[in-house]
A protein has these predicted regions:
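Eukaryotic scaffold repeat domains enriched in small/polar residues
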Residues: 1-186
Length: 186
C-alpha cells in the first residue's frame, strides 16, 4: 500500500493518522483503526511537484497543511501552506535555501512548535551556516528561531532540533577512512 514513509503525524482529536511517503504527491490519511480515508494532494499549484523528502504539519481544525521539502535546486518552492484540498495559501521561494540534488541531505523536524512547523535543512556535503525555522501556519512564512555561530572555525555537519523549552545543536565531522569511505565523529 505504501513504502518508505518519511514523515507522519497522529491527530487523536481528529481521529486521523497522516503519512507522507518519500517522493510524494500526497499525504495519505487513515483513521485510528488503520482504514484508508483519503489523500491530501500536495501539488495543487505545481502539477509536476513531487516532495522528495519532506516534513509536514496538519491543522485539521483550521483546514491547513504546512509542508517543507528538501529544496533541490530544480524545485519551485521550499515550503508552503495549503488547504486540505491542495490549494496553496502561501509559499516560500527557495532563495538561499536551495541545495544540489543529493539524498544524503535531510529535512529535520521534531514538531515541537505548537503553532508552526519547526524545520531545519541538514546538508551533508554542502556545508553552510543555517538556521532552524518555523513555518507559520497563519502567515505561511519561514521565521528564523535558532542558529549557531561557528566563528572562524570550519563549518561542521550539523543539525538543530527544537524541544518544548530548549534547542539542541549537534555537530559531526566526516573523517575519510578509505578511498571513497567516510565515517563521522561527533
Amino acid at each position: 500500500e505504501y513504502t518508505m514513509i518519511y514523515d507522519m503525524q497522529i491527530d487523536e482529536k481528529a481521529g486521523h493518522v497522516y503519512l507522507l511517503p518519500w517522493n510524494a504527491k500526497s499525504i495519505f490519511v487513515y483513521n485510528l483503526q488503520g482504514e484508508y480515508l483519503k489523500d491530501i494532494p500536495l501539488n495543487g499549484k505545481y502539477e509536476k511537484l513531487i516532495v522528495p523528502k519532506g516534513k509536514f504539519k496538519v491543522d485539521a481544525e483550521k483546514n491547513r497543511v504546512a509542508v517543507v521539502l528538501l529544496p533541490f535546486n530544480y524545485l519551485p518552492v521550499v515550503a508552503w501552506v495549503q488547504d486540505m484540498e491542495g490549494n496553496f495559501i502561501n509559499e516560500v521561494p527557495m532563495n538561499h535555501l536551495k541545495v544540489k540534488p543529493d539524498f544524503s541531505n535531510e529535512v529535520v523536524s521534531t514538531k515541537a512548535a505548537s503553532d508552526a512547523l519547526d524545520v531545519f535543512l541538514c546538508t551533508f556535503w554542502e556545508l553552510r551556516k543555517d538556521t532552524l525555522y518555523h513555518l507559520n501556519l497563519e502567515d505561511g512564512k519561514l521565521h528564523p528561531k535558532f542558529t549557531m555561530n561557528f566563528g572562524q572555525r570550519k563549518i561542521a555537519i550539523h543539525d538543530y532540533h527544537e524541544f518544548p523549552r530548549h534547542y539542541v545543536g549537534a555537530l559531526t565531522n566526516p573523517v575519510q577512512v578509505g578511498d571513497r569511505t567516510y565515517q563521522t565523529e561527533g
